From Swiss-Prot:
Its main location: secreted. The record marks 17-18 as: Reactive bond for trypsin. The record marks 19-20 as: Necessary for sperm binding. It is found in: Secreted. Keywords: Disulfide bond, Protease inhibitor, Secreted, Serine protease inhibitor. PANTHER family: OVOINHIBITOR-RELATED, SERINE PROTEASE INHIBITOR. The gene is SPINK1. This is Serine protease inhibitor Kazal-type 1. SMART domains: KAZAL. Serine protease inhibitor which exhibits anti-trypsin activity. In the pancreas, protects against trypsin-catalyzed premature activation of zymogens. It comes from the Eukaryota. One of its GO terms (molecular function) is serine-type endopeptidase inhibitor activity. CDD domains: KAZAL_PSTI. It holds the Pfam family Kazal_1.
Amino acid sequence: DQGRDANCNYEFPGCPRNLEPVCGTDGNTYNNECLLCMENKKRDVPIRIQKDGPC
């Protein structure tokens, strides 16, 4: 299972402060999907969501 793509339809800059952790395919926990999306903007290879909840 390669995970699922993050839903990155957010108004940037800034993310909502909701705490809905997701586990990225990089092994890191992100406080919400938006923060994972912001990390993806800095990368060549996007992180996907491995599972909902912390890693």
